Swiss-Prot record:
Cited CDD domains: ABC_OpuCA_Osmoprotection (cd03295), CBS_pair_ABC_OpuCA_assoc (cd04583)
Protein name: Choline transport ATP-binding protein OpuBA
Single GO cellular component term: membrane
Entry's Gene Ontology BP terms: amino acid transport; glycine betaine transport
């Protein structure tokens, strides 16, 4: 699908931003470029759509050299998403999404249908089509930025740190949505990030760059288990290598508790406290009759609100980290250890609760990792 052959970029004065990059990307593959500031990751990506012209080498998309194409026409065939989103404030959401199809002279009705179809993919209804960007939250605006890149059905999408400016919960939610979207649409994606956790979570393969050169290319598991050198090991961070000592435990389903303590939103706060006391827990997951996760309540929330509220529905918090069933365990480890989360609910694609991973669930894995390391050191000494 996409091939880079001996691609380099040299600026005036002889500074080499990218040096002799060679890479083949298959159709439908999700590739993350990552590395320290100034490593050439964004420059490499921008050479693909000729926002930056290569100084040397060749880039082929579906066997066609990009230098043989008109740069404007080339860019219209490639989706592009940036951190700043770049929505036009004077255009409606539908007009923003339909920008490239309009340039490609799609009929108006087809553009409208495409906008509604895409909004549905990210659970945004037709009521959004006539709104303006300032009426949307930051997360919703970034969703529209992604949909705009998908609107003309390009086979290739370039994404330059698209979620970098969002708060952690919104960022996490968008990553989950985008991962699900990619499974449905099978686009070829080149994604630039400075966040190793994001790369590990999203990518089929990760390309690590340093000083304009590729240091290592591999799947997240390959790189976690076999870092190419000390630079890669330090860049990954040892806290991300916890799972490598427990290769038999890979997915949340293997360690989650399938019977988390739950309550429905119509119950009283007194009933919630009684249930917590009975089950010896300090928080409850709130679900509806179909076990769709609504949010959570805990002792602290109830204590703060008990004088002015009576029902769980009045005090439940909806912002909660979740992972899909089948998610790689490393993503959940990251949420619990790095973000200080006490637990992570596991849901299906319809957000029905199927389990929970707690800090206690991870004790054996962390213990095996640390104990295995100590035994290795003892054997070497």
């Amino acid at each position: 699908m996409l091939t880079l052959e001996n691609v380099s970029k040299t600026y005036k004065g002889g500074k080499k931003a990218v040096n002799n990059v060679n890479l083949k990307i298959a159709k439908g593959e999700f590739i993350c470029f990552i590395g320290p500031s100034g490593c050439g990751k964004t420059t490499t990506m921008k050479m693909i759509n000729r926002l930056i012209e290569p100084s040397a080498g060749k880039i082929f998309i579906d066997g066609e050299n990009i230098m043989d194409q008109d740069p404007v026409e080339l860019r219209r065939k490639i989706g592009y998403v940036i951190q700043q989103i770049g929505l036009f404030p004077h255009m409606t959401i539908q007009q923003n999404i339909s920008l490239v199809p309009k340039l490609l002279k799609w009929p108006e009705q087809q553009r409208k249908e495409r906008a509604r179809e895409l909004l549905k993919l990210v659970d945004m209804g037709p009521e959004y089509v006539d709104r303006y960007p300032h009426e949307l939250s930051g997360g919703q605006q970034q969703r529209i930025g992604v949909l705009r890149a998908l609107a003309a059905e390009p086979p290739l999408i370039l994404m330059d740190e698209p979620f970098g400016a969002l708060d952690p919960i919104t960022r996490d939610s968008l990553q989950e949505e985008f991962k699900k979207l990619q499974k449905t649409l099978h686009k070829t994606i080149v994604f630039v990030t400075h966040d190793m956790d994001e790369a590990i979570k999203l990518a089929d393969r990760i390309v690590i760059l340093k000083a304009g050169e590729i240091v290592q290319v591999g799947t997240p598991d390959d790189i976690l288990r076999n870092p190419a050198d000390e630079f890669v090991e330090e860049f990954i961070g040892k806290e991300r290598l916890i799972q490598s000592s427990s290769p038999d435990v890979e997915r949340v389903d293997q360690i989650m508790n399938t019977q988390p303590v739950t309550i429905t939103a119509d119950k009283t706060l007194s009933e919630a406290i009684q249930l917590m006391r009975q089950e010896r827990v300090d928080s409850l997951l709130v679900v509806n009759d179909e076990r769709v996760l609504q949010g959570y309540v805990d002792v602290e929330i109830i204590d703060q609100c008990r004088k002015k509220a009576n029902l769980v529905s009045e005090v439940l918090h909806e912002d909660i980290y979740t992972v899909l069933g089948g998610t790689l365990l490393r993503d959940t480890v990251r949420k619990i250890l790095k973000r200080g989360v006490k637990y992570v609910p596991v849901v299906d694609e319809d957000r029905r609760l199927i389990g929970i991973v707690t800090r206690a669930s991870l004790v054996d894995i962390v213990y095996d990792s640390l104990w295995g390391e100590e035994k290795q050191l003892a054997a070497l000494s």
